[in-house]
Amino acid sequence: PGWTEIDAPDFTADKGHYTVQLPTATFAQWQAQVHLITDIPGEADTPYDFSCKFLAKKDIKGVTIKITDTSSDDNFFFIKNYDLKAGEEYQVKVPASVLKVGAADALKLVFDFGGNPEGEKVEIYDIIFQKTAQ
């Protein structure tokens, strides 16, 4: 598809285990986003660690993860891209990242699967976000 609207990914959650079904293939970043919107604040000038695990049904290149302020996409901890291999668990670890602009009242975790193949299924689990131990 071009930049026309397609069906949103099917998203289910079960006790910290998330499953994303992507029935339609996409070709560019930001075309297959899932947002986990929280009430978790982010402190200014404070490093945080993030980790999670993925398991994809098919190979998918350029999966994007971004943790950002719910009120400003310009105030974020990081934007990282990862390539997932079919059937292989992949662990993401992002240590000691700091908000770019300053404190955030609430954070959202964005997963983007733009560039996904048709019929993709991705599981996301073991999500950890915490202040870096000093």
Where are these regions (language model features)?
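Solvent-exposed serine/threonine-rich low-complexity stretches and specific carbohydrate-binding patches
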Residues: N75-K85
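Short, tryptophan-glycine- and acidic/Ser/Thr-enriched carbohydrate-recognition patches
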Residues: P1-A8
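Extra-cytoplasmic beta-strand recognition segments
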Residues: Y18-V20, T24, Q33-V63, Y90-S97, ...
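Short carbohydrate-recognition loop motifs
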Residues: A8-Q29
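Beta-strand acidic-aromatic groove motif in beta-rich domains, primarily in extracellular
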Residues: W30-V34, K58-T70, D105-L107
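Extracellular beta-strand ligand-recognition surfaces/modules
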Residues: Q91-K131
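Ser/Thr- and Asn-enriched, surface-exposed coil loops between beta-strands
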Residues: D14-G16, L84-Y90, A103-D105
